[in-house]
UniProtKB/Swiss-Prot annotation:
Zn(2+) 1 binds at D39, H41, D86. GO terms for biological process: AMP catabolic process. This is 5'-nucleotidase. Its main location: membrane. The keyword Zinc applies. It is a lipid-anchor; GPI-anchor. InterPro entries: 5'-Nucleotdase_C, 5'-Nucleotdase_C_sf, 5'-Nucleotdase_CS, 5_nucleotidase/apyrase, Calcineurin-like_PHP_ApaH, Metallo-depent_PP-like. It holds the Pfam family Metallophos. Residues 1-30 form the signal peptide.
Length: 577
């Protein structure tokens, strides 16, 4: 007789069949690796540790990044490579190629999507369309950018609010966003409109969700605080990949001199009761962001990773490095371009600029203010009127002889470090502390002595370090007729400075640690050369912006001499009459 299975065996088989059917019907968890960069700022070549010109240390560079990207693509199964904006602006590469270098090398590396940053608009819409948008094949995104009817050239069709990427059969939605303050920070023109990021991203996410997309990345360029708000407020976003604020996040001991502001990823509790990871990867291509997510039923159930430091332990890809060097050849003749003329000696010597007001410092700071004059309104003649620049960042004079010709390479000798001119918001107390710091080692030819524009400062060097500031007056910005007013410790001021001291260089840690806001700008070379081109002939003077007094009750020496001369003249005049 055939064997009849027992009831218990029959039940076990049925249960096993049911479990198998359930297992086959249930999708397995999906792992996604997100590699990301932000605020690369034209760092095509390798840099030093502080993202300036590479002399001894070796970090970053597109050829080094490519090596690590290829390694991770070979190791991990599902990989996306994303950029959160500001490929433009930051080195002589952008000054010369105007964005063509960004298009070429970001295309060569094979990015999957990019958000528009504010600096992508530094040369207007035409400077974004060509050479960049017309020469890349991946989607360029911004959900909160709208074009007015009168916009010429039209950008319609060259960027999108969002895209859907296919990663081994899984649909991943990516929504872009750009700082709504771009009209103040860059030059997009009057017909490009930057709307509220949160509302625009939510609208686009809702569209993707209605299409059945359940894995959505917000990719944008509005700064860490806005990134966190998007994670909190926007329903349906699973991860936020940001930029603009150059935020360094890291879990564990940091691998370099950069101090993390929080763990990587930074976790935000959303209003719809989820935990959303937020990431940035510092700036300048120094790190490659690495975030590994595990999705189950459209929800992130695991997140791990850390930015990868791209230092000399990672070999530069030889093929891409050869391409970099080929493009670099064209930069050599760029230094011979004549940009203007000086009829006075531009004193950029160490002795002068590290110990007293120097006219080279005045020229540089005046150029920095001029570069930021845009969009005045009924209250502000300019959004910033104060500049500080450390004397140690000025490395050479320019002679007025030989017809006073100023070439690009002349300026490169003055400003060799490739810094950017950045916008900060600080309290008056922070600015006062910076000036006290600037003279704490006065007389030792150290680099922290500050050159200025829009400031009149008095020091008493007989006081102990840390209390040598006697008086600071600042040029008002919220006024119709600019005039000097006493610095108020509890008032918030906008200032322009270079990226080196903005990041705490030369001991200016208060500018890094106490700033309320930070926006990266154009290169120092491009700012000063544009100013000289506009002026054609320059003749900066020493104007009494920085004075030394004997004590707080003593008039500045220069003003005392003027007063005595005026008194002698009046005495003579009255006597003769």
């Amino acid at each position: 007789m055939p064997r009849v299975p027992s009831a218990s065996a029959t039940g076990s088989s049925a249960l096993l069949s049911l479990l198998c059917a359930f297992s086959l019907g249930r999708a397995a968890p999906f792992q996604l690796t997100i590699l990301h960069t932000n605020d690369v700022h034209a760092r095509v070549e390798e840099t030093n540790q502080d993202s300036g010109k590479c002399f001894t240390q070796s970090f970053a560079g597109v050829a080094r990044r490519w090596t690590k990207i290829e390694e991770l693509r070979a190791r991990d199964k599902n990989v996306l490579l994303l950029d959160a904006g500001d490929q433009y602006q930051g080195t002589i590469w952008f000054n010369y190629y105007k964005g063509a270098e960004a298009a070429h090398f970001i295309e060569a590396v094979g990015y999957n999507a990019m958000a528009l940053g504010n600096h992508e608009f530094d040369n207007g819409a035409e400077g974004l369309l060509d050479p960049f948008l017309l020469n890349v094949s991946f989607p360029v995104l911004s959900a909160n950018l709208e074009q007015g009817e009168d916009q010429v050239p039209s950008l319609i069709g060259y960027y999108k609010p969002s895209t859907v990427l296919d990663v081994n059969g899984e649909k991943i939605g990516v929504v872009g966003y750009t700082s709504k303050e771009t009209p103040t920070l860059s030059s997009p023109g009057p017909h490009l409109i930057f709307k509220d990021e949160i509302q625009a991203v939510q609208h686009e996410v809702d569209i993707l969700v209605s299409q059945g997309i359940d894995k959505i990345i917000a990719l944008g360029h509005s700064g860490f605080e806005t990134d966190k708000l998007i994670a909190q407020k926007v329903r349906g976003v699973d991860v936020v990949v940001g930029g603009h604020s150059n935020t360094f996040l890291y879990t564990g001991k940091a691998p370099s001199n950069d101090v993390p502001v929080g763990p990587y990823p930074f976790l935000v509790n959303s209003d719809d009761q989820r935990t959303i990871p937020v990431v940035q990867a510092y700036a300048y291509g120094k790190y490659l962001g690495y975030l590994k997510l595990t999705f189950d039923k459209g929800e992130v159930i695991k997140r791990e990773g850390n930015p990868i430091l791209l230092n000399s332990s990672i070999i530069q890809d030889p093929v891409l490095l050869a391409e970099v060097n080929k493009w670099k050849e064209s930069l050599a003749n760029f230094g011979k371009e004549v940009i203007g003329r000086t009829v006075v000696y531009l004193n950029g010597t160490t002795e002068e600029c590290r110990n007293r007001e120097c006219n080279m410092g005045n020229l540089i700071c005046d150029a920095m203010i001029q570069q930021n004059i845009r969009n005045p309104d009924e209250k502000f003649w300019n959004h910033v009127s104060i500049c500080i620049f450390q004397g140690g960042g000025i490395r050479a004079p320019i002679n007025e002889q030989n017809n006073g010709t100023i070439q690009v390479d002349s300026l490169l000798a003055v400003l060799p470090f490739g810094s950017t001119i950045d916008l900060l918001e600080v309290y008056g107390s922070t600015l006062r502390a910076a000036f006290d710091h600037s003279v704490r080692r006065y007389g030792q030819n150290t680099g922290e002595f500050l050159q200025v524009s829009g400031i009149q400062v008095q020091f008493n060097l007989k006081r102990p370090p840390g209390s040598r500031v006697v008086k600071i007056d600042v040029l008002c910005a919220d006024c119709r007729v600019p005039h000097y007013q006493p610095l108020l410790d509890n008032k918030i001021y906008k200032i322009v400075t270079n990226s080196y001291i903005a990041e705490g260089g030369d001991g200016f840690t208060m500018l890094k640690n106490e700033r309320l806001r930070y926006d990266t700008g154009s290169t120092d070379i491009s700012v000063v050369s544009s100013y000289i081109k506009q002026m054609k002939v320059v003749y900066p003077a020493v104007e009494g912006r920085i004075l030394f007094v004997e004590n707080s009750a003593t008039l500045p020496i220069i003003n005392l001499k003027i007063g005595l001369s005026l008194f002698a003249f009046l005495t003579w005049f009255l006597h003769c009459s």
